[in-house]
């Protein structure tokens, strides 16, 4: 009986530590299933062969990541036939504009962290709006900043609004629309622009267009200022998150492309290229984590969200200043 119990325990340990892996000899079968699941169509046989080669490399990378004893799991998703360069150039968008401005007030946060709850998530208070999909337009900077304002509005008024990213893409004359932008310059341009309109008045097209504001739209929010935060201790982000609401932040998205679920520990940090929204934090199985809202649709990650381990500068999350807007509630 004792031997049976020991065998069961060993089997459980092996199962717990088993890393999910794709059989590379079945790459062709996986690829055909992938094509069917995501309705992928290619121009010719040559392109299909090239995409299959990238797909094979993706499988190898996924298997490698799943062997790292990370608590995250990586799987085939809609990006599996795209190179990293394609993904970063089309589906992220954090990029230095030709012109730069700095109207935001800089605040240095160097005090010891305060005492707050072990777990906190603005979603549990219904203060985070729905997941969006930027598609092949490098406008993450617009999505992340507007998502933070949508949350501020929900915190203040207990109502969800859906702001127009296309307004920012077309009418922000400092950032570069689908070719990229920065968080603080987006906030600064909102100040110059006046009121922000909702999605139904200025629908998302996912391409650069001339500004189509007519002047008779009904603005719902006006930004009157912005802050940039120098955070010396990652732990202080908890206090900031609870105080100002969800925070747009810059990361290196290279390591999250094939993410499926769990807490990411090993994450590339070679250069910031994507903007996401910090919405919460917590602890799972003694692993402290941050929760971020992404803009790659609900069919990616944990229904559009991902988690990274705290206090390891995962994905370079503390390499750039965090930002927030000051809303004119009297407008």
From Swiss-Prot:
Annotated InterPro entries: Papain-like_cys_pep_sf, Pept_asp_AS, Pept_cys_AS, Pept_his_AS, Peptidase_C1A, Peptidase_C1A_C, Peptidase_C1A_papain-like, Prot_inhib_I29
Catalytic reaction list: Endopeptidase of broad specificity, hydrolyzing substrates of both cathepsin L and cathepsin B
Q: Which SUPFAM superfamilies match?
A: Cysteine proteinases
Gene3D superfamilies, per the entry: Cysteine proteinases
Question: Which GO molecular function, any one, fits this protein according to its record?
Answer: cysteine-type peptidase activity
Q: Which residues form the signal peptide?
A: 1-21
Determine the domain of life of the protein's source.
Viruses
- The cysteines covalently paired via disulfide bonds are 137-178, 171-211, 267-315
EC number(s) on record?
3.4.22.50
Which residues are trimmed away as propeptide when the chain matures?
22-116
Processing and modification events after translation: Synthesized as an inactive proenzyme and activated by proteolytic removal of the inhibitory propeptide.
List of catalytic residues: 140, 274, 294
Q: Which UniProt keywords apply?
A: Disulfide bond, Hydrolase, Protease, Signal, Thiol protease, Zymogen
Task: Supply one GO BP term.
Answer: proteolysis
Which PROSITE patterns does its entry note?
THIOL_PROTEASE_ASN, THIOL_PROTEASE_CYS, THIOL_PROTEASE_HIS
Q: Which family does it belong to?
A: Belongs to the peptidase C1 family.
Q: What does this protein do?
A: Cysteine protease that plays an essential role in host liquefaction to facilitate horizontal transmission of the virus. May participate in the degradation of foreign protein expressed by the baculovirus system.
Q: What is the protein named? A: Viral cathepsin
According to its UniProt entry, this protein's organism is Buzura suppressaria nuclear polyhedrosis virus (BsNPV)
